[in-house]
Amino acid sequence: MNGLTVLKAMNGIDERFVAEAVSAKEKGKLLVLAKAAAVVAACVCLVAGGVYAYKSFQNSQLPLLEFEEIDFGGMGFEGSDSLTLEHSDDISPWNEQIKIDKLPVYKNLLYRYEGQEKSYFSEEDLLKVAQEYSELLGEKIISYEKFTDDFNERIVRNVIAQTQNHQISVGGDGGVSIVFKNPEGLTDLSAVKAKYPFLFNENDVLGKYQEFSVDGEPLGSYYKKYEKGETVEQSVVNYTLKNMRFTHSENGEIRSVNINTQQRFSEKLGDYPVISFDEAKEKLLDGQYVSSVDEVSYISSGRVEERLIRKVDIIYYTGNNQQLFMPYYRFYIWLDLRPFVTTGLPEDYEDYGYFYVPAVPEEYFVNYELFDGSFQ
């Protein structure tokens, strides 16, 4: 997530930081009650993939997983809404009827915490990645500009390289964004594929997504794709760790592509057992989850109940502030936000908050008790 705050009310985003945001976007949009009767700012602590211990679980060669709390500033919570789900394609490779026995857990080789320079891309590293993509585009880099960390100028957060027809942004987390300077004619993915075949694979799974404001007004739309794996397990990995997002301009042309390269900069620790959907739901209802949602404020009963579950998928929680990339069951939980929203929303409109239950069994953690359902 990288602590990135994305306000639904924003009209745009600084292109300098598009690449840095690639790893955050597929976690879902951050809902902000722009016209709420009261706005509460919360500093969110999410228990996410942490260090792993070089201790093996009994009768297993898999290292135990250890978690640490990660702080990131934010206002609002992570989630989605019924309009977005209704007007967007569901391309998740998993559903409740599919049983998965094992999924890999990865060590993030680009892990970074505040002030740490080691393991973070250098300016030369970022330029090398930009050069790779400029060659794929058949162009040469004319110039580039670097952007350093706000608190440590020795850390290069982003490099933006210019070619004749493209702008290539490479973030310190390895995320890549390519802006098409001349998008005329790029009205759909078939046109993009004809012009940029290296961006596509034979087994791609494609979906179109539409986002909405808190007032129910349409915002931007985009395409997302990932390569279908030979197994469901590989497809689940690709769905989060190896995907692309194509964004439309105001004129309806496809203006840019964000390329998730996190799997390229990770190390597989092993294939870990995965609990079933029913087990995950049981843990959710028992309070064994993490979330940026304050249940007391947004759930009438103050706790998650089965009747509030609207959707579930399996994703990898990522970002260069994650030491591990590991799978989670992500539950979409209905939240009662009407007391906080003064605008007239459709009667059947619903807001959802994300609640995460680790897909790896608790015996593979040394501190599973951190998943206690408290407001993170």
Language model feature labels by segment:
Residues 55-237, 241, 260-265, 375:
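Preferential activation on post-signal-peptide N-terminal prodomains/segments
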Residues 14, 276, 356-359:
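Helix N-cap / beta->alpha transition motif
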Residues 167-183, 234-260, 337-376:
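A short, surface-exposed beta-strand/turn
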Residues 183, 191-329, 333-339:
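Segments that shape or occlude catalytic/ligand-binding pockets
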Residues 1-28:
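Disordered, charged N-terminal biogenesis/targeting segments of membrane/secreted proteins
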Residues 17, 137, 288-291:
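Short, flexible helical or helix-coil boundary motifs
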Residues 10, 35-61:
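Single-pass transmembrane signal-anchor helices and their membrane-water interface zones
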Residues 27-36:
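N-terminal export and membrane-targeting signals
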